[in-house]
Amino acid sequence: NIARWTEGILSWEKEFPWSEMETDNEQRRLRELKKIAAVNLKKTSGGHTSNNGEIYRAAVDHHVIIKEQIDLYKADFIICCGTEYAFMDVCYKDREVDWKMTSRGIWYFRDGKSVVISFSHPEARVKEAYLFYALTDAVKEIMRCEEFEEQL
């Protein structure tokens, strides 16, 4: 899912039919994943499911490293995959942010040149197409709003 998301986000002006997105996954992974950085808030391995309390405590315990990583990457997009509360308390604890909601209910805010989006985990038990289109539609709306605001 992350490779699909990357392609959809970085090519947000393009329309992607699902028949195209559900195939060629190995080539997509090779092509797209080198364009991104993934940051785990919990810095130690665990099982295939996550405990939000453990993730939160781990993020707070490693807040210096996490903040340094985020600052180093200077990301265009930061997708919080179910971890926005821990992320906010680690990276934006003493800052006011202006959360906005897309027309389809995806929360986000702008931090300088970065867009921070609160979203689901890529392995959520939801159809992959639902996750892909929910996220890429949100990015399209955000980018179109940003383009409009820049023209004013």
Q: How does the language model describe each region?
A:
Residues 1-73, 77, 83-85:
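A polyanion-binding, active-site-adjacent surface
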Residues 53-67, 86-152:
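C-terminal capping/extension of enzyme domains
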